[in-house]
C-alpha cells in the first residue's frame, strides 16, 4: 500500500490487524480434516497420529502468519513480525516501536508492505490503518 503524506508530521502510527490466527473448531469441516491428514501424510511422512496430537497440531501448531514492513521515501523504517493479530508500528522523532527506527522527518511517500507467510483460511479478514499527526 502506498500513500503520499500531504504534509510534515510529528507522529506516525501504522496499525495492522487480521483474524483468525488459528483454526477454530467451526472452521475444521470433515473435508478439511481429511485434506490436512492426507497432506501431512504425503508432504511430511506423518502417519496416523492420536486425536489429541492431531488437535494440538491443528488448533495450536498451525497459524496464519502475516508481517508488516514500512518504508518512507524508499528508505526502510521498520518491520514487525510479532505473533499478534493486531500490531502497531509507531514512530516519532525520538522513539519507535521495537523493530522500527525513529523518524525525525515524517513526510513524503509511505509504503506499507504486507508480508504473507501463511494463511490458514481463504477470505482472512484484515485491516490496515495509517494515522499521522
What are these regions (language model features)?
Residues 1-133:
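Acidic, Ser/Thr/Pro
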Amino acid at each position: 500500500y502506498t500513500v503520499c503524506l500531504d504534509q510534515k508530521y510529528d507522529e506516525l502510527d501504522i496499525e495492522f490487524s487480521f483474524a483468525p490466527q488459528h483454526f477454530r473448531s467451526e472452521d475444521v469441516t470433515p473435508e478439511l480434516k481429511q485434506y490436512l491428514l492426507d497432506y501431512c501424510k504425503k508432504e511430511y511422512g506423518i502417519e496416523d497420529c492420536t486425536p489429541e496430537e492431531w488437535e494440538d497440531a491443528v488448533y495450536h501448531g498451525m497459524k496464519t502468519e502475516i508481517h508488516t514492513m514500512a518504508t518512507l521515501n524508499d528508505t526502510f523504517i521498520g518491520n514487525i513480525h510479532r505473533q499478534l493479530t493486531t500490531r502497531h508500528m509507531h514512530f516519532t522523532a525520538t522513539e519507535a516501536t521495537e523493530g522500527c527506527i525513529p523518524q525525525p522527518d515524517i513526510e513524503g511517500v509511505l509504503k506499507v508492505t504486507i508480508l504473507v507467510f501463511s494463511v490458514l483460511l481463504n477470505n482472512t479478514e484484515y485491516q490496515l490503518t495509517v494515522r499521522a499527526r
